[in-house]
A protein has these predicted regions:
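A conserved amphipathic terminal alpha-helix motif
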Residues: 114-149
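Amphipathic alpha-helical protein-protein interaction surfaces
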Residues: 23-26, 62, 102, 123, ...
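Short Pro/Gly-enriched beta-strand edge/turn motifs at strand-loop
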Residues: 20-23, 49-53, 75-81
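Hydrophobic pocket/interface hotspot
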Residues: 17-21, 27, 53, 70, ...
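Compositionally biased, intrinsically disordered linkers/stalks adjacent to structured regions
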Residues: 93, 108-109, 124, 136
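Hydrophobic ligand-binding cavity/cleft-lining segments
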Residues: 1-48, 102
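Hydrophobic-ligand binding "helix-grip"
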Residues: 28-29, 36-43, 56-103, 111, ...
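A structural signal for short, well-ordered beta-strand segments
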Residues: 6-8, 53-55, 108-110
Length: 149
């Protein structure tokens, strides 16, 4: 149902930004509406880093946890995320990192549908705004952590 994307040019090293996105256990420190996170499994399989992680997302009376399958392709500089369970009918996230001089162009695409049709309608109306807030949070975190790199 909702599908959106954002693209940002961030004045940080590509590898540091990838490390930031893969640090799922740190998300509650800076991602809006992320209340908790946990990495259950992390395996380096050569060209692929594979993780299984939970995120608890909430605002107001709404709160839910979903489990994700996260795969980082080192050769392509792409992170793909799919849901395994939780309130989502499906979730497909795609992060792409491209070096641009001393900066990195980060593309973040999200496509998802909630199992609850009412919540799905509510989310559709504010989805791009929420995605922009998440992208802002990653950019601000990168600027804070890697300012002098």
């Amino acid at each position: 149902m909702p599908k959106a994307s954002v693209k940002r040019l961030i004045g940080s090293d590509k590898d540091k930004l990838i490390e930031l996105v893969l640090a799922v256990d740190k998300y509650p420190e800076f991602i809006p509406y992320c209340l908790n996170s946990k990495i259950y499994e992390k395996k380096d399989q050569g060209d692929i880093i594979h993780m299984i992680a939970d995120l608890t997302i909430g605002k107001g009376i709404f709160k839910d946890t979903y489990k994700s399958d996260v795969n980082y392709n080192k050769k392509k500089n792409i992170i793909l995320v799919k849901n395994l369970d939780g309130p989502l009918k499906y979730l497909n996230n795609r992060w792409v990192f491209v070096e641009k001089g001393k900066s990195t162009e980060v593309s973040f695409e999200v496509d998802f549908e909630l199992k609850n049709k009412f919540l799905n309608i509510l989310m559709t109306k504010s989805f791009q705004y929420g995605l922009d807030k998440i992208a802002d949070a990653f950019q601000k975190r990168a600027e804070k952590l890697y300012k002098n790199i």
